[in-house]
Each structure stands twice: as C-alpha cells, then as structure tokens.
C-alpha cells in the first residue's frame, strides 16, 4: 500500500500542477477513470504484454462513455508507457487530497447502521465541520454491523459513536 502511494505521488502532483486552472474538471475525469481502472478484468488486460497502449486506451475510452479530453489521453498514455496503469486509483486518491488541501477541505466518510436522510446528513455534516474545524465533503456508507450510531473517518482521524464500539468498550471494561 505504501509502495503504491510512493509511486502515485509524483504522478498526482504533476497532474495537479498541470491542471491548476481546472482542478474540478480534471478531478471529475480522473475519478471516473480511476473507477474504470479498478476493474480486475481491465487490470489483467492492461498487464497483458500482447495488449498495446493504444488498445488499452481504446477500452478505457469506450468505458468512459464520452470522448476523453486530450490531456486525459496524454496522462493515461504516459501511465501505460511506464507500466503504471494499476496505480491510477491511488493517483486519483492523492489528487483528491491535493485538491482538498488547496481548498481547505477534507473528505469524510460517515458509516451508519441505517440510511441517513438529507436533512439529518446536513446536521451531521455541520456538527462534524465544527468538530474537525474544516469544510468536509461527506459521503455515507451503510454498515449494519454497527448496530446503531455512526463512525466517521476524516483522513487518519476516527470518531466512533456506534453501539458496536460502546459494546466493545464495555466488554473490555468487564473483562479487566
């Protein structure tokens, strides 16, 4: 994992510098390409020595669903030439971190046992922004094993108010 991050960092930084005038647009196509590149079948095809860079680029362009911007084609071509196609999801992650740092925000993942409606999510987001002291881009993932409550992950910080966590704390306290 750390090796992927080390490989991805220079690509993410170079792309960020090259796209400083349109970070949001670049982020949009990069995120979409990262989802496409995460496909195990496409990874296997890209790793095949008989597959040319043009063939892989054609498959990605077809899966993209719209014409790839010229700089996206150039970037993808550079990754394919250097055998770094498999690093694309990590590059997207680091690019998002650079964009967040520039805008002074962070990504937050809220894990919940139950679905959260829009108004409740807005309240949770406001409370979390106050707690963490920065603007957050909140996404929700459902995890029924939490039983109740929420667990929030912002970067390397975790705020766990789930029933599961409290039961674990009680178990440890009773066993001591």
Swiss-Prot record:
The gene is atpH. Belongs to the ATPase delta chain family. Keywords: ATP synthesis, Cell inner membrane, Cell membrane, CF(1), Hydrogen ion transport, Ion transport, Membrane, Transport. GO terms for molecular function: proton-transporting ATP synthase activity, rotational mechanism. F-type ATPases have 2 components, F(1) - the catalytic core - and F(0) - the membrane proton channel. F(1) has five subunits: alpha(3), beta(3), gamma(1), delta(1), epsilon(1). F(0) has three main subunits: a(1), b(2) and c(10-14). The alpha and beta chains form an alternating ring which encloses part of the gamma chain. F(1) is attached to F(0) by a central stalk formed by the gamma and epsilon chains, while a peripheral stalk is formed by the delta and b chains. Pfam families: OSCP. F(1)F(0) ATP synthase produces ATP from ADP in the presence of a proton or sodium gradient. F-type ATPases consist of two structural domains, F(1) containing the extramembraneous catalytic core and F(0) containing the membrane proton channel, linked together by a central stalk and a peripheral stalk. During catalysis, ATP synthesis in the catalytic domain of F(1) is coupled via a rotary mechanism of the central stalk subunits to proton translocation. This protein is part of the stalk that links CF(0) to CF(1). It either transmits conformational changes from CF(0) to CF(1) or is implicated in proton conduction. It comes from Variovorax paradoxus (strain S110). The keyword Ion transport applies. The keyword Membrane applies. Coiled coil: none annotated. Its main location: membrane. It comes from the Bacteria. SUPFAM superfamilies: N-terminal domain of the delta subunit of the F1F0-ATP synthase. This is ATP synthase subunit delta. HAMAP family: ATP_synth_delta_bact. GO terms for cellular component: plasma membrane; proton-transporting ATP synthase complex. It is found in: Cell inner membrane. It is a peripheral membrane protein.
């Amino acid at each position: 994992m750390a090796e992927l991050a080390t490989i991805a960092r220079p690509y993410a930084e170079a792309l960020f510098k090259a796209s400083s005038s349109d970070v949001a647009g670049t982020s949009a196509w990069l995120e979409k390409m990262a989802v496409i590149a995460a496909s195990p079948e496409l990874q296997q095809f890209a790793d095949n020595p008989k597959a040319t860079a043009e063939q892989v680029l054609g498959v990605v362009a077809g899966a993209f669903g719209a014409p790839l911007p010229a700089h996206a084609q150039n970037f993808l071509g550079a990754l394919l030439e250097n055998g770094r196609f498999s690093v694309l999801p990590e590059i997207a992650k680091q690019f998002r971190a650079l964009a967040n740092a520039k805008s002074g925000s962070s990504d937050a993942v809220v894990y919940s046992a139950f679905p959260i409606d829009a108004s409740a999510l807005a309240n949770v987001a406001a409370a979390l922004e106050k707690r963490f002291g920065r603007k957050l881009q909140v996404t929700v993932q459902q995890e029924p094993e939490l039983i109740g409550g929420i667990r929030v992950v912002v970067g390397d910080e975790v705020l766990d108010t789930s029933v599961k966590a409290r039961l674990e704390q009680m178990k440890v306290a009773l066993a001591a």
